Amino acid sequence: MVDVSGIPGAMRLPSALVRLLENVVRRAPSDEAACEAARRVVEAGLSGEAGEEVDFMPARVLFQDFTGVPVFCDFAAMRDAMTARGGDPARVNPRIPCVLVVDHSVAADEAGCPSALADNLAVEARRNAERFAFLKWAGASFDNVTIVPPGQGICHQLNVERFCEVVGTDALWGGEGAMACFDTLVGTDSHTTTANGLGVMGWGVGGIEAEAAALGQPIPMLVPRVVELRLTGELAPGVSAMDLALTVAELLRAEGVVGQVVEATGPGALSLSVTQRACVSNMCPEYGSTAVLFPMDGKLFDYLRLTGRDGAEVAFAEAYVRAQGLLDPEVPRVYGKTLELDLASVGTSLAGPSRPHNRTTPAGLKGRFEGAAARNGHGDMAERFTVETGEGTFELGHGAIAIAAITSCTTATDAAMVVAAGLAARRAVEAGLAPKPWVKKVLAPGSRAAGLLLERAGLRGPLERLGFYTCGYGCMSCIGNSGEILGCLKPWASSMELASVLSGNRNFDGRISPDVAQNYLASPALVVAYSIAGTVDVDLSVEPLGTAACGSPVMLADLMPTDEEVAAVLSEVLDASLYEEGTASLMEGDATWRLIEAAPSATFPWDPDSTYIRRPPYFEIAEACRTFSLEGARCLVDLGDFVTTDHISPAGAIAAGSPAAAYLEDRGVDPDRFNTYGARRGNHEVMERGTFANVKLENRLAGGERGCVTRDLLTGDLTSVWDAAEDYRAHGVPLVVLAGRMYGSGSSRDWAAKGPLLQGVRAVVAGSFERIHRSNLVGMGIVPLELVDGDAASLGLDGSEVISVDPVDFSGGLPDPAVVWVHGLQRGGKTVDFRCRVRVDTPTEGAYLTAGGILPYVLESLL
């Protein structure tokens, strides 16, 4: 037992580090180890800088199905490997609770009609029958696994509404004993940080790190630097949580908080509702911080009661938080830096066209759109395109909105924003306004409770009058499952600069739809407004949305409800019965799900003909690497700044003519059944062919072409990335990826590391790395090398070089040397020598590399 209150300065730690301190001390294997871990946390906290490595042991793991299916494929393969080595496959079992929510596979194939929800659920079940059967097997065959069936909601919203405990006991989370402790988690989706709005410490990790955590392995991490975001004032009337989230994203991306924890403090933080806080925390990956933690207060405990948590458990949690000293906002705490934001300065906001931190306003959107369109070669705003719709023929210009989507846990978790969208729709109907006929309207509530809220408030009808019929209870447009744009715009997709407006958290190139060039994030009420405008080439601060039936112009302000109107609706319909009814059938699923049979077994019966679920090869191809070096390597792709994991491993539709499409066609799969890359993540043979296959990927070796194209440096020919990788493999040539700043930003997508590994990539040379992706690379045995002396352009690198890397020794854990020389031999015999920092940041990560990756490392620990 360690009394941390006796450690000088421990009570002055940021509240985030109080939680971390409790975790590392409680989970330490001995009192001596606990004292050492406590010292590291306290010293780092009081210094205001990042500290040494500690072992974080989350209480639970949250999965969504796109990342969860490959995790359980890996578990099943690990059981096979355990059996092959003479071990007991039952030892491969989660030690802590794991919840997987099926939320990523539903798509808005049908929209704008009363049958959309039922039709999309039916298509989802047909497309994903193999995946769903596998998940049912996993739920029956592994301990501590809960599968939430499709059609129930988004994992992060359900986590906030149902699964977050805030405080629990060891016994609750798979251990023994009744000692209280803070709820903590990791999730295989970067927006796991939504829970930070409830004061719950958690963040996104790659699937491979989540696997290790589920199997009882600690997650090594450096004690993070904690930055204070002091909020003052209150939000102005009509300003939404989404407006605040986009403002914070702009502020913190500019400040640079990658790998740091942000702690919201001050009277402004306490003025926000719990779900407003959750909206801000949800978007924390968009500026690279590990977490954005909000304070615990009376509003939190009221929210827990509202959402149906047991009253005695809530009282217990409140008493524990008070005993830990976290209910007193006046306790002086030490931070590495303090930033300030006056909430009264936040205004109505959007973000785009391709980065969530590129904030603008309704007044600035027109200029933002036109500037981006000009850069895309569509600068003639007078150009017109004849579009035939069911309501007539229209002459449209660039900026026409193809998709308007009320979607995502980012905004649907906040009941006020959901109600505001419904009230805006009601005002539009009363004024005689309607969305333009070329706009595809998507409504995807984040949970059944959110959908029930609209129904109880009498707001579902107005939304449906505008064409916003519920399409599904899942992520949908936010992750690119938008379905096809309407047929009237499809012929013009390559000629017009089309746009989307959505209430989601990401808008990367090609993410929402391959046919849409620009994507803008906004609150749900603004989505309703822009669907009526029909274009983003408009200044809604001065231009009308349309003309009312009485002949008067209708402005944006005329549509937006007041805070008092929203509050009046919430006071009538928002109560515990809403959440009780909304989650009553959470674990049951529909009739199709209930009919799926899956008998439990120690090992999975792999189907050799399956194109969805195949046994991954990681345990067979793993190479132990005590000393890393490269000779004669070539660059597979040469990329720029802000390359996202979606660029590396797309989740969207499998394009005809792509290597993945050819693979599926060779196995008798019709093109209309290709499904998406996300749905095929249980098949490594599809995914390795789909790596670097995003249609918007810009590769400097591709001769100006976009997509899965590169130059095979052995032949000089332009070919697919997959075919080039296969040629290099046949000739025994190791591969590197060359990239710019913030490589691997975006989703916590482990396939963005698994795919390159299977293509033969041994190292990534980049200007900088996003947190989760860097750890994923290490976990798969790929070495991240961060440029020290400049970027590729300033160094004179063009991607054609023959690359060699001097030896790096990992036998001691941390890389030796920490900064290594890399040599690029160019045509003509010139050599470019430059230094890279080896971004293997902890001794445990070094141990992963020496074992050939985290999966072989964990397997050896279980034998």
PLM segments and residue spans:
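Mobile "lid/hinge" segments at catalytic clefts and subdomain interfaces of large enzymes
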Residues: 176-318, 326-327, 342, 417, ...
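Long, structured ligand/cofactor-binding scaffold of large enzymes
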Residues: 29-231, 243-246, 348-351, 359, ...
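Acidic, glycine-rich flexible loop/linker segments
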Residues: 548-561, 773-848
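Segments forming glycine/polar-rich beta-alpha architectures that bind adenosine-containing cofactors
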Residues: 601-673
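Acidic/polar, glycine-rich intrinsically disordered N-terminal extensions of enzymes
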Residues: 1-60, 592, 600-601, 605, ...
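Terminal amphipathic helices with adjacent charged low-complexity linkers/tails
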Residues: 57, 75-130, 263, 269-378, ...
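Extracellular/luminal Protease-associated
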Residues: 265-272, 505, 730-770
